[in-house]
Amino acid sequence: MAIDPQPSSPSLSSETIANDTIGNDNNVNEPSVEPKTQEHQHTVPPRLSRIYSQAHHISQSFIDQNYPGEGTTQVPYRINFLPDDSQNAQLPPPMEEVGICGIKQVIRAFGISQEVATLGISLYVLGFTFGPLIWAPLSELYGRKKVFFFTFMVATAFSAGAAGAGSIASLLVLRFLTGSIGSAPLSNAPALIADMFDKSERGLAMCMFSGAPFLGPAIGPIAGGFLGETAGWRWLHGLMAAFTGVTWIACTVFIPETYAPYILRKRAQHMSKLTGKVYISTLDADKPPSSAAHQLKNALTRPWLLLFKEPIVFITSIYISIIYGTMYMCFAAFPIVFQQGRGWSQGIGGLAFTGIVIGVILSIISFAFEDKRYARAAQRRGAPMEPEDRLPPAIMGSLLIPIGLFWFAWTTFASIHWIVPIIGTVFFAWGLVLVFMALLNYLIDSYVIFAASIMAANSALRSLFGAAFPLFTRQMYDGLGVQWASSIPAFLALACVPFPFLFYKYGRQIRMKCEYAAEAANVLQKMRSLHVTVTEDDAMNEAEEMWRARTHNSHTSATHSHGHRRSLSCTRSV
């Protein structure tokens, strides 16, 4: 399975998608000569030792290979990974949200309203809208490791700054910047997993990663509730700064560069300097050069084009955004229901999020079994699976979400034991992640070469919903009461239940009538039959040309038909 958890996301490059669709063909045009030197043995884990060691070292074995080409500017040597290449990330080895709990302290410290304090959550999540659109293309230009190093370093500084903020304005700005800078893992961590694991291997890894954006905001209040109650809100941000700083150091020390096009591009440059001959990566050989400005322009505009022109993308993104926003609404509602309604302390109130944690864990376990079911079904079929085959978990999840939300809404009375509404949140979280992961997989399989832009659009839209929903939660609960206010998202989820069923039954017919989905299917067929790699830019241009030609033919046909009818009318009148 390949998905953008929260995020997920512009996370998969076109090279990764292409390799997945036609098989693991990294060795096409690769010389069969074995390396002449033995790799040094390391004590770090086997997979990491292969890709972390000699990160920028060009050994004589690289230069001695018989690469295709002549080594000239016109016909450069085309390099690829060697059979036992230490930097090939896919070579197999040998046999967040503790700030939610500090809202009351922030209100007292700065003398502000509940709505302004809630902006700290909303602006943080709003940063998820813009950050991945920038960090994903930059990681393809400058590598995953450099982006991780920079973003974790700056996010650590901003979190530390938030801990010492002297005004609410500076705190809100720092929260937004922390979300924007710290959102790099939402796009680049799935890409790193795709770099390291083959499509058949990455299902469980992606499953675990996809649960993290839901587990983080749920686990955070459990620990943060007691910390905020005893040490104050500044220590919550201090804890986040410490955690991000440790992560920054760990990423710097242990995470190697994994993006194959960047590794081979840098290797070709180094080998060209060493030998005086011209080398080029096989992954770059047939592509026009692409600047950072060009990639950023596409990253900022193309997702919105696909979002509003493709019905499948729009409907699934709206559905995911509603349930994602509902999750953040729950984070704002739980203090109202359990602390205000039942008199729980801030620390004990954080324990109400335990149901969300259990539901997310159940969904990860469910997807581990679903991954095996999907693999067996693909093996039995003996042919590529249809995107609609990804939807059964979404069908199940679409039913669990309204069940869990209605359960929670109408068991929040003080006369009912507190465990009962928390059990309802288990079903909600279970269904939420099932729908989230299944629909993202469906979008990726439906749009293949456009997957990065589709994930970017989905991530941006759901982050907007996640930022907006908490802002009106307090007013909604004050105006409607706990039960009916909690039922509003349940009714929205209930209205969305038919979507997975309709896509499962009619998805193929709908896809073939969508401009870019149809082009993605054509590109996928071309890559499978001809074993060629097609970039997202190429596919976009081809889709637009086909659409223009189809529109022109339709206009010409309509004009001809109108002229013919007019001629007949004139003949009759004569």
UniProtKB/Swiss-Prot annotation:
Its main location: membrane. CDD domains: MFS_Tpo1_MDR_like. Induction: Expression is up-regulated upon exogenous application of fusaric acid. GO terms for cellular component: plasma membrane. GO terms for molecular function: transmembrane transporter activity. Residues 9-30 have a biased composition (Polar residues). It is a multi-pass membrane protein. Glycans are attached at residue 19. Residues 1-44, 552-574 are annotated as: Disordered. InterPro entries: MFS, MFS_dom, MFS_trans_sf. It is found in: Cell membrane. Keywords: Cell membrane, Glycoprotein, Membrane, Transmembrane, Transmembrane helix, Transport. Pfam families: MFS_1. The chain crosses the membrane at residues 116-136, 148-168, 176-196, 208-228, 235-255, 318-338, 348-368, 394-414, 419-439, 449-469, 484-504. Fusaric acid is phytotoxic to plants such as cotton and banana. It has been shown to induce programmed cell death in plants. In addition to a mild toxicity to animals, fusaric acid exhibits acanthamoebicidal, antioomycete, and antimycobacterial activities. Efflux pump involved in export of fusaric acid, a mycotoxin with low to moderate toxicity to animals and humans, but with high phytotoxic properties. Constitutes a self-protecting mechanism of the fungus against critical levels of fusaric acid within the cell. Belongs to the major facilitator superfamily. DHA1 family. Polyamines/proton antiporter (TC 2.A.1.2.16) subfamily. This is Efflux pump FUB11. It comes from Gibberella fujikuroi (strain CBS 195.34 / IMI 58289 / NRRL A-6831) (Bakanae and foot rot disease fungus). The gene is FUB11.
